Amino acid sequence: MIKLKRVYEAAASSDGSRVLVERLWPRGVRKASLRIDAWLKEIGPSNDLRRWFAHDPKKWDVFRERYFAELDSKPKVWKGLVQAARRGPITLIYSSRDPEHNNAVALKDYLQTKMKQAKNSARRKLVA
């Protein structure tokens, strides 16, 4: 299971592994106060893509396409999250004010798609 939480929301035991998925450290948050298990800077969108998007909902669909292309080019960065999500809950921690149009939302969709693809591939191998 993959959950999402804003960096300013309190941690809970039900969060499972908490992973910060931002390239930049969130403003106004002390490292000692943010309860995370990992900070995957490399999984965040590139600086160019992040600046271009600028959290503009009108650019959301194109942002997702470009971000997914970036993720496709670096599977080593996200495969560990897929494995962790299979073992138990993980929570992607993000800093955006917009809960619907941010890289964590896109990343969750991407990871869930990869999990479904792997599951379907395994089923096909069992049937064959």
Regions found by a protein language model. Name each.
Residues 1-128:
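Residues lining hydrophobic/aromatic ligand-binding pockets adjacent to catalytic sites
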